[in-house]
Amino acid sequence: MLVPKRVKHRREFRGKMRGEAKGGKEVAFGEYGLQATTSHWITNRQIEAARIAMTRYMKRGGKVWIKIFPHKSYTAKAIGVRMGSGKGAPEGWVAPVKRGKVMFEIAGVSEEIAREALRLASHKLPVKCKFVKREAE
């Protein structure tokens, strides 16, 4: 499970998710990628579930790059607690993903296997995704 080693502040503001991703919009390391077409928070558990779905389908073949990291903490108050009395306790970690960001990359497998592996991974994520290929140089 991906979590930061240490953070400066345990509780963060939620922030705004406006516009497109600034960087990481092209396939950089692998041959094929999974690009977000909507913006959302992706938890460390969802990233791990997507990684497992991809690697199980690829059966020890190829290489996977995870290009997002859950660095932002989110908080939640206990069930049945009334409003007020401060911010809730840290609940988990999320990676804010804006539209256009390539989240996962694959190399070393055929296009059919990569397409199916990334399709299986996309079902584990709360964003709409599309399959992208590396640009010819």
From Swiss-Prot:
Keywords, ordered alphabetically: Antibiotic resistance, Ribonucleoprotein, Ribosomal protein, RNA-binding, rRNA-binding, tRNA-binding
One Pfam family, short name: Ribosomal_L16
Domain of life: Bacteria
Positions of disulphide bridges: none
GO biological process, one term: response to antibiotic
This protein's GO CC annotations: cytosolic large ribosomal subunit
Subunit architecture: Part of the 50S ribosomal subunit.
HAMAP family: Ribosomal_uL16
Job of this protein: Binds 23S rRNA and is also seen to make contacts with the A and possibly P site tRNAs.
Entry similarity comment: Belongs to the universal ribosomal protein uL16 family.
Name the record gives this protein: Large ribosomal subunit protein uL16
Organism the protein comes from: Streptococcus pneumoniae serotype 4 (strain ATCC BAA-334 / TIGR4)
Lineage: Bacteria, Bacillati, Bacillota, Bacilli, Lactobacillales
Gene name of this polypeptide: rplP
